[in-house]
Regions:
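Long Lys/Arg-rich low-complexity intrinsically disordered regions in nucleic-acid-associated proteins
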Residues: 1-116
Length: 116
């Protein structure tokens, strides 16, 4: 999936998740199938966060310090040995134009939808 937005999204890293607080930036992402609205924030899954960082579309900060892709993937790998594999699968599906959401469990990592 190519990116049709020029704006770099700003997010805060809180509780191991990227959180987008700006409503305009939330709209940019939700229109493209990213994240889940929780109260007044858009929360991104780990694979969405990695994907946006990898494609240089996300500026992620924790206490005014930028977090880069390599740092974040290492953090996720400490808790989940399959984090890199999940990211690569997610990236492949998004690149092919699919909207990808977190799975429901029971051995399902993703839900995959055609865009539209």
């Amino acid at each position: 999936m190519s990116f049709d937005f020029e704006t770099k999204i700003s997010a805060k890293f809180m509780n191991e998740k990227a959180v987008v607080l700006n409503p305009k930036m939330q709209n940019i992402l939700t229109e493209r199938g990213f994240g889940e609205l929780q109260n007044d924030a858009l929360v991104l899954d780990s694979f969405e966060t990695l994907y946006l960082l990898y494609n240089n579309k996300l500026e992620l900060k924790k206490i005014n310090k930028n977090i880069i892709f390599d740092e974040l993937i290492q953090k996720y790998l400490q808790k989940d040995d399959d984090a890199l594999t999940r990211f690569l699968l997610y990236r492949d599906l998004r690149t092919k134009g699919y909207v990808v959401k977190d799975g429901f469990g029971f051995g399902s990592d993703f839900r995959v939808y055609e865009k539209g």
